[in-house]
Structures are given as structure tokens and as C-alpha cells.
Amino acid sequence: MDQEEGLKALDNIVTQFNAYEDFLDSQITTVDLYYLEDETLARQLVELGYRGTGERVKREDFEARKAAIEIARLAERAQQKTLTSAGKDLQDNFLTALAMREEDNRSGKLSSVIFIRDRNSHGQEISGYIDYAHRLKTEDFEVYFTGKKRLLPRPTDISFYNWDADIAVSNSSPNYQVIADNPEGLLFRYKRDRKILNVDPKAQPGDNSTRITILTELYVQAVIFDHISRRKT
């Protein structure tokens, strides 16, 4: 039996029995009990490999695999519970794009900056850059993925501009340092690997970064910048 088959066989045993003792009992025959007259001794002989009707499984292997399967199960449940976009009927390309990036932004594998230009509830033209991972941690996105509200830039985001009121605000976030005094335009430095994200549409976005324009009916303009950190953690 090769390693892969052995692991598969162990998984079958681990999922079939709640405890190692239950597995040992399944390997004990009525003949064993008749001659040994001691269930504990019979279990010990099975554990040592002297008795049993199947493959010998060590206690430490059983318990380690049992723990690993349980950890994986809990992680999957937590992930399903955490992903706000899961199971939603997404009606727009923009929401689909956010859903595709939600898990990786929550885990830190990816860092996305969202540019949005549109009008607010007062009819004023606004635009701004949103640190997606930070907003995911500080806000419930249920209302956005269900379509009850639109995601819009705020004065608390990494960059915000109200064109009608001529108000410009920038704020560094846990993920990005804002470089607002650059003569060639706004820059963001990703704090994890110190790489620069250039949001100028005429320039390259930077190392390990991409720029994607989203065709959407929700906004006048929507662009997503994706940055993958190469720094080892």
C-alpha cells in the first residue's frame, strides 16, 4: 500500500469511528474475547498489532489525523461564515469582482484598492480610493452584496474627493501609506512589502500589481487595483 492509499484508508477509519477505542473494539472478535477474557487486554493486543482483522493503526496516527480533519472542518465552516458574498445572487460585474476577491483580501493573500467615481445621495460628484481589505474588517458588506446599498468612497477612506464641494481628503490605512505630495500624482505604499501602487491610468500600477477596469451599471467609473505581496510571513 502506497502513502496515498494509506492516508485514504486512515481517513476512512478516522471518519468511521469517534474514538480510537471504538476502532480497536471493531478489530476484536468474539473468539479473542473468549480466549482472553479481558477486553482491555484484547484492545492492547490489537494496538500492538498482535490481534485484529484489518490494518494496524497507531493511536498517535489516529488521533493526529482526527485532529487534522476536525481543524479543516472548522476552518471551512469559519470561511463559509466569514465570506459575506457566499450564496448571494450578484446582479452586477462590480459585485462579482468584489466577491471573487473577498476571501483573498480577508486572508491577506491579496490587497485590492477600489476606485469609484459616481454621485452621492445629494447628487454631488464624488470619487475615491477604498482599501477593500480594511473596509471588509470594519464594515458589514451584507448590504452591498445584497444590493440594498451601493459601496461608495467616504472621507475616511485612503482617498476621497468631492468635486462639487472641492473637498479632498486622504488617510493612511493599516495596509497603505498615502503619498499625496508626489508631483506626478497620488501614490499608495503597501506597508507589508513597501511596494508602491501607482493609480495613474497612464502609468504602470507597479510591481506585483494589476489594474482592471470594471464594466458596471452601478457607477460612472469603477477600477480595481490588485496587489500581491511577495513578502514572506
From Swiss-Prot:
It comes from the Eukaryota. Signal peptide: none annotated. It is found in: Cytoplasm; Nucleus. Keywords: Cytoplasm, Nucleus. One of its GO terms (cellular component) is cytoplasm. Pfam families: DUF4464. May be involved in spermatogenesis. PANTHER family: CILIA- AND FLAGELLA-ASSOCIATED PROTEIN 299. This is Cilia- and flagella-associated protein 299.
